[in-house]
């Protein structure tokens, strides 16, 4: 979907609502509140798009995993991993947010992290092998980034029957909470 298509859908879904501002969790890199490249799993036209003009209110845009991380954060050093279509990631250290792009880092001799824990990997590998990969990647990144805990979110995080040690599951409304947090 293009930004125009999504904005049309949002306006239709919120018809009759009054709002003063908009928070957008964007599935890709964001710098200074602006998308840096078109997302891999959506249409073109995101870079340079005028969201303020389209919505007619102030807009803040951050990476979607970063938004969910903000709504999940419980203090200290936390790594957020979003298990959805791809692999989203963000790091929060003592309240300071650092969006990450870990998805395309190499994983063993098996492609990238995303190729082993994204939605296509779940379908290709099956739940048992996919779960093993999630546990392995969580442990690998937890050690490498020296975090106290990992938060797992995204639609496929619910597929995990158990969680790796020092891991929590992000709440369903974490992205919404993160969107509110942006305006504090």
Regions found by a protein language model. Name each.
Residues 1-8, 12, 91-124:
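Short glycine-rich, Thr/Ser-proximal phosphate-binding strand/loop in the N-terminal lobe
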